[in-house]
Amino acid sequence: MSNANPTNDELCIASITRISYINECQEYTLCPNVRYPGTVRFPGFFCCVERWNNVEKVILQEVMKEMKLSDRVILPLVGSAFQPGKAAEAIEKIKDKELAQIAQGEYYFFSAQAEKCVETVKDYLDHDDVMLRLSADMLYTFANLTLGNPQAAQCTREDVQQCLTRAMQMDAPVNVRAACLFAFYVISIFLHIPPEEGTPPLQQYIPYLPIGQRLFAVSLLAHEIYLKQDYANAKGVVQGAFLMTDGVYPIAMIYLGCVQAMCQINLKEQEEAIQTVTQAWERARLDKFMEPFIEYHGLLQGVLEVCIRKKEPEMYKKLVDGVLAFSRGWMKIHNPKMQKAVTDLLSPLEYSIAMLAFRDWTNQEIAEHLGLSVNTVKHYVSGILEKLQIDKRDKIKDFVNQ
């Protein structure tokens, strides 16, 4: 076999465990953890796009062999049933050390400790075990949005896409396909970037997920329906999910509660929305799971302000700081992919008011909802229009999420 160095358009490398590449009956020695132009990434290694057809079958079989070996689950803490305030104990009960470390990364992420999350999961981004890899990819993607590293987030987002593509092409075991699709939809739906045509529907694989992950996936499904503005149906999906639970899965239930409240506020069921968010907040409080509320702040349209702003001003300030950091990173991925650019000119409270104003809420209704005076709301709305350089409140829809 030849030890000639590969040219940039020929190939690329693997992880430390993949140090050679076979092309046209020649074996090349590769440089670990170096990626060359014109390559694509797969679990455990990279491969050249131009020479891909010559080795596709061999490489994909190796990828799928590694995927089949995994009997782990994706996002183990999301899938854990435990009483609120007992997240640390739930992690301690996970005997698999690597899975426990992923669960610790989840804890850091959901408790809005992005730097600790990234540090905890970074070593799993190239792991041969697809469940560990996908879990790390998701956490790394969203944590880096908060940290203002959109390029790092984009890399792991692409890795999830590639894992999904290969799992589907090679007809991987159904649990692997379900995990890949779950990871893909987590990122796509939260970024409000529609999946490519031909992507299998999420609901087709939800039954193959463990119950906790299944509940979280149902929250994604409801979120997807919400984005189609079918609020009553989305709310019904959430309510059905709560009925099928066999225990307390705090993380999934917090996300379900947020989506339900999003639907309720759009149906002008204000009291119900406030009650739903209050329940979700109480479920999150003991473990300090702030991240769901940071991610859903804008779509909750002022409900967080009603529930937390005056009652817990210090906690609300932490939420606001998190919202600002996360939303800036979110926009750097979302805006280039979509025709409409979501604005970063508004404060979290202004954004909440803007979300209500363009949906034909009157100043009086907004004031009553947020506990503000009508004059204060008028002042905010005028300031929003000025910042966005528009003259009518119905034009706000071009600058915010819907």
Region locations from a protein language model:
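Extreme N-terminal basic, low-complexity initiation segments
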Residues: 2-13
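Solenoid-like repeat scaffolds
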Residues: 89-97, 122-133, 160-174, 200-213, ...
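Linker/hinge segments immediately adjacent to helix-turn-helix/homeobox DNA-binding domains
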Residues: 186, 210-348, 364
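Tandem amphipathic alpha-helical repeat scaffolds
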Residues: 62-80, 99-113, 134-150, 176-192, ...
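Helix-turn-helix repeat elements of alpha-solenoid scaffolds
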Residues: 73-89, 106-122, 148-163, 188-201, ...
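Flexible inter-repeat linkers and adjacent short helices
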Residues: 1-2, 16-22, 26-37, 41-134, ...
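Helix-turn-helix DNA-binding segment
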Residues: 333-382, 386-391, 397-402
